[in-house]
Amino acid sequence: SMKLWNNRNYISFDFTVYEKNIHIMSQPMGTLRSISTDDNAKALMNAKKYYTSNILIFDAGFGTLDLYDIVNRKANSKETFAQFGMRAILEETGKRIQERSGVAIRSAAMQNALERGAFTITERKGVKISTKTEGFADLLEAATKEICEQAVEKVINMYNALDEYDYLILTGGTSAVWEPYIREYFQAIERLTVVMGNENCPDLDIIFCNVRGYYMYLIEWLRRKSIQK
């Protein structure tokens, strides 16, 4: 149910969804679709090279890192790791802040600290209270790099140092933060090309690449369906 315009009451809707109209796509596959299609859901010139190459999709978000590999045109597996992502970065940053300054920042308060770029240290002596602001950009950067290195180490161990892969496709908000590190780590691998998930739609935030791919697939599917009628 939902409210429409100035209507004070909720209006209920009933929808019937048939199984034949349900299509499930894994999250990282949305990015593969996205980098292969233009804004009219038409295949780009480079679409063929992606679908005929060995690809590892690296989807780092807030809570998890999802890895999806395609080798010899076959989707092999999807792996999910909860210890890599922005949540892990913030938790590690919080630990470093507490170790250095003795201040415990709750997860709910971390967003405010990030927006300010600093946190407040409160000291009390009797009835006298003093406060001072302290930055933590260095701790955040160190935590970001550490979690990224752990994630890359996992990838290297699981996928034979990416020796068989042509493309490493980065998608997800945390991947955008890690991009400089990842490019540095893999720059000497001749065969491997690092590609951002929004390479053909740079004005789109990378967190929406998967969704764009779903949408483009839907348009393509509806177009094929209309032609078949």
Regions found by a protein language model. Name each.
Residues 68-110, 206:
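Glycine-rich phosphate-binding loop plus the immediately following alpha-helix
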Residues 54-76:
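Basic (Lys/Arg-enriched) interaction patch that binds polyanionic ligands
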Residues 57-63, 115-123, 148-149:
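Short, functional N-terminal and low-complexity linear motifs
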Residues 1-55, 74-77, 82, 86, ...:
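Nucleotide/phosphate-binding catalytic cleft detector across ATP-hydrolyzing
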Residues 63, 174-175:
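Gly/Ser/Thr-rich beta-alpha loop segments that engage phosphate groups in nucleotides
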Residues 99-141:
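A mobile "lid/hinge" subdomain adjacent to the ATP/sugar-phosphate binding pocket shared
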